[in-house]
Amino acid sequence: MKNLTAPGPHQVRPIVQTNIGNPYSAAQMIALNNFSKEYYQLLVTCETDVFENNNATFPLDRALSQRYVPEEILTRCSSLSEEGIAELKTFPAIVCMENTGFNGITDPNQTAIFAYITRVKMEGYQVRVAFQPIAPFHQKILCEQKYAIYFDLNMSCAITDLNRTAWSIHKVNLFEAFNESGLGYLPHPSI
């Protein structure tokens, strides 16, 4: 995705424009309305072209391993079976680049993407995850101590959850986290 920047506070910049007044595509709306309200995925990468290619690659030891997934869904999601991948596709995702600094600090212009997963593919000793962006936002919001708790992120140490390439799942209602952190303008499921 080219020239993608986060909107200003309380603004939504459409990714896809349609003729019927809805700024989101049918596929995006279907994904939104099917999203889990119990879990979300966090994809943190060091790949600089992640938003141009809309995919990220993770080493197997940093892709949904025991350290990165709630115990109750570890077996079924981490196996990357057809059923596991189908379940993963129901979890909303945040995709971002590694923070530019330590201790919860990143460039104020760094963008994170609210997205949904479209494909998961094993490639040797790594996993490639393709995603479809829904909306951008400022990554620094995830780094702020007062908001990090709502996303189940640890920002109180030198190397935080956003400093290391990894694909993880958090037991958090992402839409409640958006509301608590001032990102309530991002699209939500209609139900």
Annotate each predicted stretch with a short phrase.
Residues N3, E72-I73, D152, D161:
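Acidic/proline-rich low-complexity IDRs
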Residues R128-I191:
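Contiguous surface segments at macromolecular interaction interfaces
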Residues M1-N34:
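Long, low-complexity intrinsically disordered regions enriched in small/polar
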Residues Y24, Y39-Y40, F51, Y68, ...:
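Sequence-level detector for tyrosine residue identity
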Residues D61-Y147:
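Structured alpha/beta reader/binder surfaces that contact nucleic acids or chromatin modification marks
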Residues N34-Q41, C46-V50, N55, M122-G124, ...:
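Extended alpha-helical scaffold and adjacent linker segments that couple domains
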Residues G21-I73:
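N-terminal "first-domain core" detector
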Residues M1-R13, E82, F102, K121, ...:
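Exposed regions on extracellular, virion, or secretory-pathway luminal proteins
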